[in-house]
Amino acid sequence: DHQLYRSDTKMSLLSGAPFDDPSWWLLHNDQIVAARDMVNDFAGSQRMLGHTVITPGQDGWMDEVDRAIEVLKPDSWKSYTIGDPLSPSKYPWRLDDEELMYPFYEKAVKAARNGGPKATICIHKGLLPPDYETSFKGVWQYATVDDVPKAAQDWPEMNFVIYHSALRPFLELPDQAWNEFEESGGYIKWASDLAAIPEKYGVTNVYGEIGSTFANSAVAHPRFCAIH
């Protein structure tokens, strides 16, 4: 009520996050869509959008894609290439994995052409602790953006929205990232790589989202926030 009807907020997007242990899921896909539909019905207009969270590589994940297209009718898709955002996952994956992901893109594009969910996939990238090379050993590479260019080139009808703009710091002051920025002459780990993709690879379907990273730095380090 306060967020949508007593504030200047005009639109919101309800999302979720997957975990290797399903009991940890923040919201399940049916809950996301039910909440979206309730808010929009109450408002009498579209005030909330909703994701379907997909889990590439896990059993039955493409069945959930089919169910979402036919039943849930989300506004777009959400996933985590690192698999599990809080601990090393058994199910990391890459956007440019032709065998795993390209059949999904094909379904997503076809559904969008037929009036279904937008051909937009929102991907969690970045947001790892300072010791990520050890605490996420073997999987941290999946939180970087080196898998974005080929997927974007091969699927121009898909929109790739990279959440957090792949900024590395998570639940910490961005001082370390700022120092790296100054010492490198203007490079922000992974976020700069993302920003370079459209011009470097000639694509127009890659976007950076800044919600959490803005919140993490706007007050604590406004100079870094402005540059990022």
Identify the function of each model-found stretch.
Residues 4, 13-14, 34, 38, ...:
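Surface-exposed intrinsically disordered loops and tails
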